[in-house]
């Protein structure tokens, strides 16, 4: 993987290998949590945060549940729950987040594929020949599709058809994909084929949002001539959002970048123009200008 540059500014981009590799997200998260053992991290699970809001003294932030009880309170809050951030943040904090639904088609893995290592393949999605789910079930998968502006988790048979078409395209040059296509059709006929929908989070310019979040109360004062330096930020409130389909790749890097920003570290892992490109303060200006264009 590498960063690519263009003449105007740095761009977050990844070079994909033709044959990819598989990582279990849950195993990766567990490894990160294990690495934090001995730190001051307190993991709280089984709680639903309904909103993030200033504490009464306005010097801290509170994570509040649906019954208005404070779950946690701290000097710094980081919102990093993808498109669901729209329900945590104030309604008038306009970041221009967009849902991008994607459907994966999957079924029981071919026993032959589980007995030997086969690479993942890419074409308008990824074909993964075999991996274990959290239920210790071994499956294959193909996907996912893209539907910008859609947040519904309901599967659509047309997306299964789209995933089959992508797999069929792979099959024109890959015997492995041809076998997978045969398995796809067999399981579709037997009723073993299944679908799963996830919702990505994207920004207006499709770049991540990483850093100090804008002060919602100051957004009403912005005008067409406002610059990002005119956008006030909410002290202690940060965000890591809009990672799109690259969250697994970008989250570790941008997590380090965000930690440095919170600590006020002047050294950075990214060049200044790239930091500016992912600055959350750009978001309300983009939302305002997009609305102006739509009115014309």
At which residue positions do the language-model features occur?
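Short loop/edge segments at beta-strand edges and connector loops
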Residues: 45-47, 53, 194
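Flavin (FAD/FMN) cofactor-binding and adjacent substrate-gating region
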Residues: 1-39, 51-57, 221-222
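Hydrophobic/aromatic beta-strand patches that form the interior of the parallel beta-sheet core
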Residues: 44, 78, 238-240
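Active-site substrate-recognition segment that forms the wall
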Residues: 76, 80-235
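Active-site catalytic microenvironments for nucleophilic, acid-base chemistry
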Residues: 35, 80, 91, 257, ...
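Short, hydrophobic/aromatic-rich segments at coil-to-beta transitions
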Residues: 57-62, 114-116
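Core beta-strand elements of the Rossmann-like FAD/NAD(P) dinucleotide-binding domain
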Residues: 66-76
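C-terminal catalytic lobe of FAD-dependent flavoproteins
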Residues: 180-296
